[in-house]
Amino acid sequence: MENGTDELWHQFAYPFGPHPDGAVGLCAACRRLGHCRLGLLAEELDDSGGMRAPIRVPIDAEGGPGVAHGGWTAAALDEVLGHTLVLHGHFAVTGTLTVRFVKPVPIDRDVMGTARIVGHEGHRWSISGELTLATTGALLASAEGVWVERGTDHFDRARSWAAEQDAMTGPEPSA
């Protein structure tokens, strides 16, 4: 493994489309853990093409007493919205993400992530979604964003760019 990458990413073996058992498609770091560290438990497309994902808010997402850090909330929404395209068989990366925080998200509780595609033009997909409390449906946060479809060489290009940046810095200055 080099710079956080592994052979699965190098070969781009990411699973696209819905899993027959509703399992969550895991990123490289979560594959090593064997579960989604953001707490996604399952994911499925509904009859209208929208995505539903039950989530257990992890205790280690705690920011303030008993509530999730806003960064966790944004990351969970990014994952739910992005996985909507994965379940439809598209690889895209987040271009923009705007999050509206409505209520504090309680830790160690079940929430529901939902998302839907609201537009598509060229390589850009507009998606919106929300997190709600699973027990009551109370809105906790919502998001909208644009995802940009990429080819399977996306991560190779990212590594090349990072190597170019590293080459530009030269040796560390001495004290």
Named regions from a protein language model:
Residues 1-19, 105-107, 118-175:
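HotDog/MaoC-like acyl-thioester-processing domains
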Residues 3-6, 21-24, 46-47, 60-65, ...:
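Short acidic/polar alpha-helix capping motifs at helix-coil junctions
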Residues 22-68:
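Catalytic strand-loop segment that frames the active site of acyl-thioester-processing enzymes
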Residues 23, 36, 49-53, 93-97, ...:
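A generic structural signal for short beta-strands and their flanking turns/coil linkers
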Residues 43-45, 116-120:
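Short beta-strand micro-motifs enriched in acidic
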Residues 53-55, 97-101, 115, 129, ...:
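A structural signal for short, well-ordered beta-strand segments
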Residues 67-75:
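Short, conserved micro-motifs enriched in small and acidic residues
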Residues 73, 79-112, 117:
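Hydrophobic beta-strand-centered segment that forms part of the acyl-chain substrate-binding groove
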